[in-house]
């Protein structure tokens, strides 16, 4: 039997909280450093304006990140809904209005969870793939009582630590990384699922996996 602490949603929230607090500490540390710099300039009779402006910018970033993370951590679970997995994936792909998305395979299964949150999770993965400007393929698969959608596009993940793309402050040119992927992982975990990123040759594969709903 799985203990409460080992459940996907608990593990995902714990991981998010660790990363969130680390990312929040980074701009706050910068605020402290620049305020100290402003004080030293002031004591020398110099203009502290530049240091104060940088401190203000970092403080605004920290506050924005804090509000987003707080909202996410305090969000209450909503009504559980059961729906067809394949239809859900197809609607999400068509909803983007992208012509270069190909869907292969089928599962014939159902999943259950907060549909609006799962919509957001799948959308975050799709948007990242579509923004790569390459042809995107989606492969549906059923394995060991789990339903999976693999979203593939040409591209490269960071070779040092792909997991940092799930960090709330992570970002990239034209990418919806960061809080979008962090939210996707949390929302999938709330439904007993997982979100993974992997590199296969010259292609990035984002996988959203959910337990099949029986009956």
Regions found by a protein language model. Name each.
Residues 33-34, 49-98:
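Conserved DHp (HisKA) dimerization/phosphotransfer helix of two-component histidine kinases, i.e.
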Residues 102-110:
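Conserved catalytic submotifs in the C-terminal HATPase_c
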Residues 135-146:
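Short beta-strand/loop element within the Bergerat-fold HATPase_c
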Residues 30-45:
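Conserved C-terminal segment of the DHp
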Residues 134, 192-193:
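Conserved glycine-rich
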